[in-house]
From Swiss-Prot:
Keywords: Chloroplast, Heme, Iron, Metal-binding, Oxidoreductase, Photosynthesis, Plastid. Heme b binds at residue 19. This is Heme oxygenase. InterPro entries: Haem_Oase, Haem_Oase-like, Haem_Oase-like_multi-hlx, Haem_oxygenase_CS. The lineage of its organism: Eukaryota, Rhodophyta, Rhodellophyceae, Rhodellales, Rhodellaceae. GO terms for molecular function: heme binding; heme oxygenase (decyclizing) activity; metal ion binding. Pfam families: Heme_oxygenase. It comes from Rhodella violacea (Red alga). The keyword Ribonucleoprotein does not apply.
């Protein structure tokens, strides 16, 4: 049986645990606490560039399909904003300096896989990323600016939805669009399940960054200890 459904509510309720787990990854907790390492952050932006490029390419590919069309909003696209940030953090030749991390490769491979086999599952990834960006974007922007002493919007274009004037209203309309998609019960369950996978894929990226951040601190401490053992060193 195919019918209109409260997909937005089912996605929210069905991902509550995964959402909470993602927020409790050490990297995310540190970020929310105002501890932001520039090297780790710019790798995060690079990772997101590859993820959003995959999502947006595949969404565009299916934009006229009956299932994808209701939630295809170009004003949500993050790729160009991420390119702006990447130029800020890496310089004009940023394309030669960035690469997807191992966890990011798994993520983008998943996007391309479901686009080929079950494109309706792209809904889950759009829900997970875009609604999250709209909901917490301004808070994360302020944290990023404060932690890295940024001003004038430099390095935080990712959080700006310039073509969306009223984010609260847009989110409400997006949820209504989700609810308008004609889906079977089994399709809804698959989409909710895929949304949980999306959260886990994001967690893997955050965990990877946390591990790299710890390595950076360890190297810094090791070098500092070596320095204080050198003859003539003064603290």
């Amino acid at each position: 049986m195919i019918y209109d459904t409260n997909l937005a509510l089912q996605l929210r309720q069905g991902t509550t645990k995964a959402h909470s787990m993602a927020e409790n990854v050490s990297f995310v907790k540190s970020f929310l606490g105002g501890v932001v390492d520039k090297q780790a952050y710019r790798q995060l932006i690079a990772n997101f560039y590859f993820v959003y490029s995959a999502i947006e390419d595949e969404m565009k590919r299916h934009q006229e399909s009956q299932i994808i069309k209701p939630i295809y909003f170009e004003e949500l696209n993050r790729k160009s904003s991420l390119e702006e940030d990447l130029q800020f953090y890496y310089g004009l030749e940023w394309q030669d300096k960035i690469f997807p991390s191992p966890a990011t490769k798994v993520y983008i491979n998943r996007i391309h896989e479901i686009s080929n086999t079950s494109p309706e599952l792209l809904i889950a990834h759009c829900y997970t990323r875009y609604l999250g960006d709209l909901s917490g974007g301004q808070i994360l922007k302020k944290i990023t600016q404060s932690a890295m002493n940024l001003s004038g919007g430099e390095g935080t274009a990712f959080y700006e939805f310039k073509d969306i004037k009223d984010e609260k209203n847009f989110k409400q309309n997006y949820r209504l669009a989700l609810d308008s998609i004609h889906l079977s019960d089994s399709a809804i369950k698959s989409i909710v399940s895929e949304a949980n996978i999306a959260f886990k894929l994001n967690m893997k990226i955050f965990q990877e960054l946390n591990s790299n951040f710890i390595k950076i601190i360890a190297i810094f401490l090791f070098n500092f200890i070596k320095r204080i053992k050198l003859p003539g060193f003064k603290s």
